[in-house]
Design a protein with these regions (language model features):
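Transmembrane beta-barrel strands of outer-membrane/channel proteins
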Residues: 1, 26, 38-42, 51, ...
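Repeated loop/turn-to-beta-strand initiation elements of outer-membrane beta-barrel proteins
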Residues: 33-36, 89-92, 158-163, 201-205, ...
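Residues on the lipid-exposed face of transmembrane beta-strands in outer-membrane beta-barrel proteins
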Residues: 24-28, 79-85, 96, 147-153, ...
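Outer-membrane beta-barrel signature, preferentially recognizing the C-terminal barrel domain
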Residues: 10-25, 29, 33, 42-93, ...
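Surface-exposed extracellular loop regions of Gram-negative outer-membrane beta-barrel proteins
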Residues: 1-11, 17-23, 157-166
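Gram-negative outer-membrane beta-barrel transporters
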Residues: 97-101, 105, 110-112, 118-216, ...
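C-terminal beta-signal and adjacent terminal beta-strands/loops
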Residues: 44-45, 102, 213-216, 236-285
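Outer-membrane beta-barrel translocator domains and adjoining extracellular loop/strand segments
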Residues: 2-10, 50-55, 62-64, 104-112, ...
């Protein structure tokens, strides 16, 4: 509605954006096992309608979001460099990445509270849901950089099955160059490991995921504690006619840890689910 409503501001003008993206990449083979991979790119992204015109309480995020109709395109130059190896039974990579934004569009806390309302269809009876934090869609200069690594090692294969180990990790630093503070909701150091087993139609895996605490945040945001979770699954594949099926049991966060994702705007009011067990049947045609 161009006239606006309780969730979106009035729009008395038309916004038109032409976004372009360019990228190039290369791989240099050092020897039969080792190689270098590099990528360079330039991207533009047009702001979405809610980044431009939001002006109300967002039920899903528990925030009062305010857009900016004057936002320009998001523009970024990005580069990454990775060292890869693959000897058949053992393969992985370690790499670094860097991105510079001229106009990073982020949802940034103003530090203020706004009154949230819900309408139940009766204009004479608004139900006050109390004060909720205000977040502004803003375009800022920003810098992202970090490191990431992954590894898969085929441990052994015998009559008892095939065993493999998967390892991965990543770390990102992101700064608001306009304020000098860290950007909000950036994931901390994350480390993952998984032990995989398969034998004929059977498969199973055990995963351990660790996230460090996140203390790098704007002054008006909260930090998050680190956590380590355990997951496990077992599955059996079978065929029905021309269809392939998988019956599985999967457990997540089996140690029932309190997990608050640093990247979630709801982290202070809604932690991630605790212990869960799922039984399922999946097919592909």
């Amino acid at each position: 509605d161009a006239k606006g409503n309780e969730d979106f501001a009035a729009a008395d003008s038309t916004s038109t954006f032409n976004a372009v993206s360019l990228s190039s990449g290369a791989v240099y083979q050092l020897d039969p096992i080792w190689s270098l991979a590099a990528n360079l790119g330039y991207t533009e992204r047009a702001p979405t309608f809610y980044e431009l015109y939001a002006n109300g309480a967002h039920v899903a995020t528990g925030a009062y979001e305010v857009g900016d109709a004057s936002l320009n395109k998001e523009k970024a130059i990005a580069a990454d460099l990775a060292l890869r190896f693959d000897n058949g039974t053992h393969k992985g990579s370690v790499g670094v990445f860097y991105s510079h934004f001229r106009n990073y569009i982020g949802l940034i806390s103003s530090g203020n509270l706004r009154e949230g309302h819900h309408h139940d269809g009766d204009d004479d009876h608004d139900h006050d849901h109390g004060d909720i934090p205000e977040y502004l869609y803003q375009g800022v200069r920003a810098r992202f950089y970090g490191i990431e690594a992954q590894d898969r090692w085929q441990l052994l294969e015998n009559r008892y099955g095939s065993f493999a180990l998967e390892l991965s990790g990543d770390y990102t630093r992101a700064n608001n160059l306009d304020t000098g503070e860290p950007l909000p909701r950036i994931a901390p150091l994350r480390l993952n490991s998984g032990l995989l087993w398969s034998l004929e139609r059977w498969q199973a895996r055990v995963d351990v995921q660790h996230a460090a605490s996140q203390q790098r945040k704007p002054s008006n945001e909260t930090s998050t504690d680190g956590y380590t979770t355990l997951g496990a699954s077992v599955g059996y594949r079978f065929d029905v006619g021309q269809s392939q099926w998988l019956a599985f049991v999967r457990g997540e966060n089996l140690t029932n840890q309190t997990v608050r994702y640093a990247s979630s705007i709801l982290r202070d009011i809604a932690p991630a689910p605790g212990r869960s067990v799922e039984v399922g049947l999946r097919t592909s045609f």
